[in-house]
């Protein structure tokens, strides 16, 4: 069966990852000891996408957990589902990366990376037909960003033909842990552009806004934010894990969403948004779901799709609904808002339908869009990066670990190129497309 190998790195990655496994376990009816307690055949039909079955009938997540300090792992291990993970798959150092990308990618992380790769290799060898990898990490810290991108490039070397999907939490403008976030994020994007196939872009600020505005939470905690992320992560892969009428896998997703190889940063959304405590919407209709899904306030990264155009988009509906109605709604959205879609990619919105809804809901939808407006986010990080880099502020932390200023300059220009590529396709029209191809050949 088409297995996915999940890797989580750094504090943020481990916390999101732990939450994700809680959601997936609940959906498949697996309790915290790894025992199946579900009530329907479909839960076990493709359980091996994410789980290995142990000899005693326990289901063990195909997950590798890594960090450069033991703290977060200890809290994952002592958490509700902590005992379900394979103990050998916890790989951690003691020193920490101190929010320093260079420590994660070149010094501390480089020392630990071989033990992580050994675990990855072992899990990959146990797979029947490995479909790809999914990596959870943040780009603002040291481990998730530095060691995370190091691992991605190493996996890329060893498994060049497997899909590499990342859930990357970007540094957000208002919610910031560290002053060097723009450095870490820019250095990471430089890697992700080259080595990842698809990146789901998340951002704390947008998640905070959703929690405040839509879910009416007074003080959203990271737990609430991770809850939103895990709902989306589970939605992205539901087609792989449950039977459906229109199925998609990581590769089909990529083929439908990525018109140009470098432009693989997606904004994601989820509907219906309900706060953890209350599922006040007893039932929603497909039109209501569709409307909420396309709403700019629902996007989990701080970029406004109304400021750009969609190159492509994909919607994954879950629950019992008519495919015909789904198709009608999607066409309806495109016709009414045609200016927000590039006209030189016809039929650029795909939908898939999976029969099994998330726990506690009748129907739900996960949205993935490849919109040119995501350049806003890169542009913002780039501005912050430039402001500090001009003055060479904090650079000694990086050069002290053996980095060269040249790497910063390269990463900066790669990110700026990415921004201008998005802008170029935002402005492109069907008639002028020929000119761009010539430009590309020269470049």
From Swiss-Prot:
InterPro entries: Beta-tubulin_BS, Beta_tubulin, Tub_FtsZ_C, Tubulin, Tubulin/FtsZ-like_C, Tubulin/FtsZ_2-layer-sand-dom, Tubulin/FtsZ_GTPase_sf, Tubulin_C. It is found in: Cytoplasm, Cytoskeleton. GTP binds at residues 11, 69, 138, 142-144, 204, 226. Belongs to the tubulin family. Tubulin is the major constituent of microtubules, a cylinder consisting of laterally associated linear protofilaments composed of alpha- and beta-tubulin heterodimers. Microtubules grow by the addition of GTP-tubulin dimers to the microtubule end, where a stabilizing cap forms. Below the cap, tubulin dimers are in GDP-bound state, owing to GTPase activity of alpha-tubulin. Dimer of alpha and beta chains. A typical microtubule is a hollow water-filled tube with an outer diameter of 25 nm and an inner diameter of 15 nM. Alpha-beta heterodimers associate head-to-tail to form protofilaments running lengthwise along the microtubule wall with the beta-tubulin subunit facing the microtubule plus end conferring a structural polarity. Microtubules usually have 13 protofilaments but different protofilament numbers can be found in some organisms and specialized cells. This is Tubulin beta-1 chain.
């Amino acid at each position: 069966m088409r297995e996915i190998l999940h890797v989580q790195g750094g504090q943020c990655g481990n916390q999101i990852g732990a939450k994700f496994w809680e959601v997936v376990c609940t959906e498949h009816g697996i309790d915290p000891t790894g025992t199946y307690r579900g009530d329907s055949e479909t839960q076990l039909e493709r359980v091996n996408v994410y789980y290995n079955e142990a000899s005693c009938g326990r289901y063990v997540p195909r997950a590798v957990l890594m960090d450069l300090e033991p703290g977060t792992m200890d809290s994952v291990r002592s958490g509700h589902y902590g005992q379900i993970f394979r103990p050998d798959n916890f790989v951690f150092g003691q020193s920490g990366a101190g929010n320093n990308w260079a420590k994660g990618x070149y010094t501390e992380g480089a020392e630990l990376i071989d033990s992580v790769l050994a675990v990855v290799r072992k899990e990959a060898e146990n797979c029947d037909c490995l479909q790809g990898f999914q990596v959870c990490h943040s780009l603002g810290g040291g481990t998730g960003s530095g060691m995370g991108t190091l691992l991605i490039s190493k996996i890329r070397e060893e498994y060049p033909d497997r899909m590499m999907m990342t859930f990357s939490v970007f540094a957000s403008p208002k919610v910031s842990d560290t002053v060097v976030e723009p450095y870490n994020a820019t250095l990471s994007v430089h890697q992700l552009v080259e080595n990842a196939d698809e990146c789901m872009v998340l951002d704390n600020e947008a998640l905070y806004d959703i929690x405040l505005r839509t879910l009416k939470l007074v003080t959203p905690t990271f737990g609430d934010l991770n809850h939103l992320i895990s709902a989306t992560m589970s939605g992205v892969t539901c087609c792989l894990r449950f039977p459906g009428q229109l199925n998609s896998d990581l590769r089909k997703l990529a083929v439908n969403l990525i018109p140009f190889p470098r432009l693989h940063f997606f904004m994601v959304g989820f509907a219906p948004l309900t706060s953890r405590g209350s599922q006040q919407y007893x039932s929603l209709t497909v039109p209501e779901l569709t409307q909420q899904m396309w709403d700019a306030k629902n996007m989990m990264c701080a970029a406004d799709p109304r400021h750009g155009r969609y190159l492509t988009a994909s919607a994954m509906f879950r629950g019992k609904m008519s495919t015909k109605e789904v198709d009608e709604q999607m066409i309806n959205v495109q016709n009414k808002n045609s200016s927000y879609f590039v006209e030189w990619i016809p039929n650029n919105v795909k939908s898939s339908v999976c029969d099994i809804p998330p726990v506690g809901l009748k129907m739900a939808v996960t949205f993935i869009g490849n919109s040119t407006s995501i350049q806003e986010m890169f542009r913002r990080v780039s501005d912050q990066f430039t402001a500090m880099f001009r003055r060479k502020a904090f650079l000694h932390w990086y050069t002290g670990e053996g980095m060269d200023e040249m790497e910063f300059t390269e990463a900066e220009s790669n990110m700026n190129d990415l921004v201008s590529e998005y802008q170029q396709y935002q402005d492109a029209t069907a008639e002028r497309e020929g000119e761009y191809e010539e430009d590309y050949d020269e470049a």
